[in-house]
Amino acid sequence: MEMIITAATVATMFFNSATSESNNYFYNAQMEDGKVETLSVMKNDCNMLTNKLQYRFVYDSQDRLSVKEALLWNERSMRWEPDYRLDYAYAEDGFSVSMRKWNKKKDEYGEVTEKMDYAMVLDNVMAINHYECVKGETMELKSN
């Protein structure tokens, strides 16, 4: 069984969250060729919508999610600022997700700080390994 996160999966997640009535958040998706490229999250504060988060999505040639970038709204500068980035890599038995945090001093994403590996080991059984970077040097298994 091939595990992939496609453009359709991202669109479904958006539509499910956008139709939920149980929160004070509103969602605006910008779509291109049937794919969600940007998802903005706004909060209803005293009947005024304020920007909170923005997600940007990049897909590979097979329409699989390859990058999800999260940005936070800076009220002082009135701009979206990078927070973290998730990079997706696919294999026959599953996929991995690597996270890199934004380094404001260097104005770029840093090294991978966390990684999750998802692999099908049996029919309907998925193994998940969670790694964290230790002292900025090596990835250490934290849970599985």
Regions found by a protein language model. Name each.
Residues 14-144:
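Buried hydrophobic residues that stabilize the cores of well-folded domains
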Residues 1-9:
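Sec-dependent signal peptide recognition
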